[in-house]
Regions:
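Class I S-adenosyl-L-methionine-dependent methyltransferase catalytic core
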Residues: 1-176
Length: 176
């Protein structure tokens, strides 16, 4: 495993490489693009070691990984608060249903205060529409929402399982 940074973060943004079980033997999904991880390996990642005492977690899950995502959140030391749904412009793969949504679980560790700007609490929405682009790339609308709702001066942010560097964010993953 790649070592985690020796730093504490108030904002954790994670898009784990979930091991999905498809209906056939042909590689058609995420396994064509990057190495996948078993649920237990994601659950057991020592993410709590890099979390500040008061932190926010934004954890991407596919529809069939919702329950496991809640287990991951708990094992990483966060309490579930809400779910944010990305409504996509076109459907993807699926078994019984073809997916047109993806979800980001929001959790809190400790008591990170609400972000206040000009006397008003900054709030996001629990759903948004954005076009799909390349495989597994998450929409920038989500990152902007995170920065609106959670980021405050002096906070450290990290993108776990990152596939690209983003200004102002720490990154961790085997695709950087």
């Amino acid at each position: 495993m790649i070592p985690f940074p020796n730093k504490k973060y108030q904002i954790i943004y994670a898009d784990p490489p979930w091991l999905e079980r498809g209906g056939g033997k042909i590689k058609r999904g995420a396994d064509r693009h990057y190495n996948l991880m078993k649920d237990k390996d994601i659950i057991n990642l020592p993410v709590s070691q890099i979390c500040a005492d008061n932190a926010h977690l934004y954890l991407w899950v596919t529809n069939n990984k919702l329950i496991v995502g809640l287990e991951v959140m708990k094992s990483w030391g966060f309490s579930y608060k809400t779910i944010i749904t990305w409504n996509k412009d076109r459907f993807g793969l699926g078994q019984y249903f073809r997916g047109i949504t993806e979800h980001c679980l929001f959790g809190v560790r400790g008591s990170l205060p609400y972000k206040i700007v000009d006397g008003k609490r900054q709030q996001g929405l629990t759903g948004f529409y954005a076009k799909r682009t390349k495989h597994s790339k998450k929409p920038e609308e989500m990152r902007r929402m995170i920065e609106k709702v959670s980021y405050q001066d002096g906070f450290n942010m990290i993108d776990l399982f990152a596939r690209q560097k983003t200004e102002g964010w720490g990154v961790w993953g085997d695709q950087i």
